[in-house]
Structures are given as C-alpha cells and as structure tokens.
Amino acid sequence: MDQKKDPSNNLTERRVSKVQRPNKKKVRNQVESLSRNLERNKEGQLLQTVSKGHLEADSGHSLGREKENGELGIRSIFYDKDWNPRGTAPSHYRNIPYNPATFKRRTEVQARLGNLENIKIPK
C-alpha cells in the first residue's frame, strides 16, 4: 500500500479524518465545557454589573487617590463624615485605605471619664 494513501501514516489525513468523524465522547465533553464556561461568564458579568452599581451609588465620595495630597475619601482610615469628609491624612502621616478585615476592632471601647462621669456619651 502506498504511504500517502494510508491514513495511519499520513498526519494530514489523520487530522482530516478526526474532523470528519469526531469522537462522540470528546464532542460531548467539549459542549459541556463550553456550556460551563458560558455560565461562569454570565455570573461574572452579573457581578461586574452589581459592582458598577455600587460604584455609581458611592459616586459622591472619592474612591481613589486624588491630586497629590493623598486624599482617599470614604476609603481612608482617617475618614469621618463630620470632621474629615475628604479623608485627608494628617501632616507627616501616610494615608492608608480602610480594610475592614485588617482594622477590625477586637475589643470594645470603655470610656474612662474620671471625675467627669456626669457627661453624657453619644451612642
């Protein structure tokens, strides 16, 4: 038998025969894989849409560094809605984004007023 005519020896013929007569199991696995990828992509798009909505809702606050003064807005550890709404750091301090997991308060704050116990503490 001629070597060019024998599909077992000719790489091109083997590739063509695999495309013309695909293995059903491989095709099924590929279809399942593609459908899983499509579902993951849809979930990712949904999360991106939700995140974008949160960003738009917080658009009144700064979400990133501004100018050269290191303002972080609501994300700053120095942020306070009454005293420091821009989230600027005091002089000689570096501004750090607030991370709830890192800066979680481990103990409850107890007021020590000494002789000033008659002063009402806001809650």
UniProtKB/Swiss-Prot annotation:
Residues 17-28 have a biased composition (Basic residues). Its main location: cytoplasm. GO terms for cellular component: cytoplasm. Residues 1-42 are annotated as: Disordered. Disruption phenotype: Increases frequency of mitochondrial genome loss and sensitivity to freeze-thaw stress and high concentrations of glucose. Residues 1-16 have a biased composition (Basic and acidic residues). It is found in: Cytoplasm. Keywords: Cytoplasm. Pfam families: NpwBP (PF12622). It comes from the Eukaryota. Belongs to the AIM4 family. May interact with the nuclear pore complex. This is Altered inheritance of mitochondria protein 4. The gene is AIM4.
